From Swiss-Prot:
Disulphides: none
Domain of life of the organism encoding this protein: Eukaryota
UniProt key word Zinc: yes
UniProt xrefs under PANTHER family: CXXC MOTIF CONTAINING ZINC BINDING PROTEIN
Residues given in the record as Zn(2+) binding sites: C33, C36, C68, C71
Keywords: Metal-binding, Zinc
GO molecular function: zinc ion binding
Protein name: UPF0587 protein CG4646
């Protein structure tokens, strides 16, 4: 079992906090089988609030379960409880871990941010729900503070973590 952290980096303009709408946020990931190295071409969605029970060895189920098409190995991924963290203005421009995945047989290799982010603008400004970061940049107008808010140069990477 390997723990993998999803790190993001972005330049924030008049934004105090960027976070997923966990536990209902769907992380869209491309995965690689740790056994044979086969990498999926399709996006798989993993949501903390959803569990699948494909394996009789784990009655609680998993957040994600798949069988490798190449080697037939059964792989699963869970989102580590309470591992979700916001990306804040203090983090702007640097990579920060926002969620940790517990991986058994499959590892994430690519992340697509898509819709479902929450943005809190600076100085107790407007809250934005269901923000779509699929274009890697997002701009809106904060009517409460009469200024623009934005997220630019969104990037992500995965890092292996020690337990």
């Amino acid at each position: 079992m390997v723990r993998v952290g999803l790190q993001i980096s972005a330049t924030l303009e008049n934004v105090d906090k960027l976070e997923t709408s966990h536990p209902d946020y769907s992380f869209f990931l491309k995965l690689k089988c740790s056994n044979c190295g086969e990498q999926s071409d399709k996006w798989h969605d993993i949501t903390e609030s959803e569990r699948v029970q494909q394996d009789s060895r784990n009655a609680a189920g998993f957040n994600f379960f798949m069988k490798c098409k190449m080697c037939s190995r059964e792989n699963s991924i869970d989102i580590v409880d309470k591992s979700n963290a916001p990306y804040t203005a203090d983090d702007s421009g640097a990579f920060k871990t926002i969620v940790v995945f517990e991986c058994r047989g499959a590892e994430p290799v690519e992340f697509s941010p898509r819709v479902g982010w929450r943005v809190s603008s600076a100085e107790n400004g407007q809250q934005f729900e269901e923000v779509d970061l699929s274009e890697d940049d997002w701009v809106e107008y904060d009517q409460k503070n009469n200024n623009s808010v934005g997220i630019y140069e969104f990037a992500s990477k995965f890092i292996k973590l020690k337990k």
